Swiss-Prot record:
It is found in: Cytoplasm. It comes from Ictalurus punctatus. It holds the Pfam family Ribosomal_L37e. Component of the large ribosomal subunit. Belongs to the eukaryotic ribosomal protein eL37 family. This is Large ribosomal subunit protein eL37. GO terms for biological process: translation.
């Protein structure tokens, strides 16, 4: 029984497959857990000892469909249902014609 170089050629089964949550090939088939995001755990796996890994998958690295809108609304103070004041240039142009 060898446990080194000669036994590596006998490996032929897949231990990891694609994860449903993060998409990486880190989902362990026998353990049924993802090594990257921790699926099926409810909380996403993240550690401070790898600041670079956090940077790769934090807010702002994707589309941010919702957060883009929130940032814009925040700048305007989350106002809703108001009508903008008419601009002077627009008022002058409409009155002259």
């Amino acid at each position: 029984m060898t446990k080194g170089t000669s036994s590596f050629g006998k490996r032929r089964n897949k231990t990891h497959t694609l994860c449903r949550r993060c998409g990486s090939k880190a989902y362990h088939l026998q353990k049924s857990t993802c090594g990257k995001c921790g699926y099926p755990a409810k909380r996403k796996r993240k550690y401070n000892w790898s600041a670079k890994a956090k940077r790769r998958s934090t807010t702002g690295t994707g589309r941010m469909r919702h957060m883009k809108v929130v940032f814009r609304r925040f700048r305007n103070g989350f106002r809703e249902g108001t009508v903008p004041k008419p601009r002077r240039a627009a008022v002058a142009a409409s009155s002259s014609s």
